[in-house]
């Protein structure tokens, strides 16, 4: 990408992108290098924008970035972002910044009533369940319990099906997938449930293995959010 000649695509109507957020997110705060590291690909998006000169553009990144990074991006893209949480549409908390010149309604919809219970599959195979003992269960909390095993706290969290799940991340395995309490037992969310949490059709990613499905979906955008932003284009 750093050597691509974007002028050959000049005249396209729409440019979309989202550079890797690893060096912007608070999840990686201890490694933060602002707009360097993997996130420096943002500057390639800027170059593409300048060389292609599309009618519209959309750039997405994490809402947990620091103010310095946010202002640099805003200055180079020539607009301020709108913060949209996917929980306005799906059963996932996923706050993101969106920079765009698309003239859409910037009043963010309220949080939707959809919870994990509304997207969970029935008859989930045993391979998705864990046999680790659980800490005390509190059904009044979003994270209602933790699995008892030696791992990072965030990987031991078990979500209450009556709430929304935390942000999906790009993981392949190692018990890092989001977990839910199902029939008194902890299990990882299935790939289909991940798809539903991003607004994708069931089995949309079924052509690849589970590990790649989790990673791809966690790296993606929430379909409903993008549709909300794009809906004004149908009248343009």
Segments predicted by a language model, with ranges:
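Conserved active-site and SAM-binding loop architecture
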Residues: 1-236
């Amino acid at each position: 990408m750093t050597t691509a000649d974007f002028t050959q695509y000049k005249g396209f109507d729409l440019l979309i992108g989202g550079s890797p957020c690893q060096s912007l997110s608070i999840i990686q705060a201890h490694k933060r290098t602002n707009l360097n590291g993997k996130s420096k690909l943002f500057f390639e998006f800027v170059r593409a924008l300048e060389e292609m000169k599309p009618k519209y553009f959309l750039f997405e990144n994490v809402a947990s970035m620091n103010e310095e990074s946010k202002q640099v991006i805003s200055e180079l893209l020539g607009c301020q972002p709108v913060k949209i949480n996917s929980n306005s549409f799906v059963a996932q908390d996923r706050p993101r910044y969106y920079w765009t010149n698309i003239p859409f309604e910037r009043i963010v919809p309220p949080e939707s009533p959809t919870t994990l219970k509304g997207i969970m599959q029935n008859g989930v195979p045993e391979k998705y369940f864990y046999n680790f003992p659980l800490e005390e269960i509190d059904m009044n909390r979003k994270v209602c319990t933790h699995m008892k095993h030696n791992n990072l706290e965030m990987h031991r969290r078990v979500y209450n099906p009556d709430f929304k799940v935390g942000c999906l991340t790009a993981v392949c395995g190692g018990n890092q997938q989001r977990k839910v309490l199902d029939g008194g037992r902890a299990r990882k969310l299935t790939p289909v449930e991940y798809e539903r949490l991003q607004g994708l059709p069931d089995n949309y990613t079924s052509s690849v293995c589970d590990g790649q499905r989790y990673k791809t979906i966690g790296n993606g955008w929430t379909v409903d959010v993008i549709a909300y932003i794009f809906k004004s284009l149908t009248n343009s």
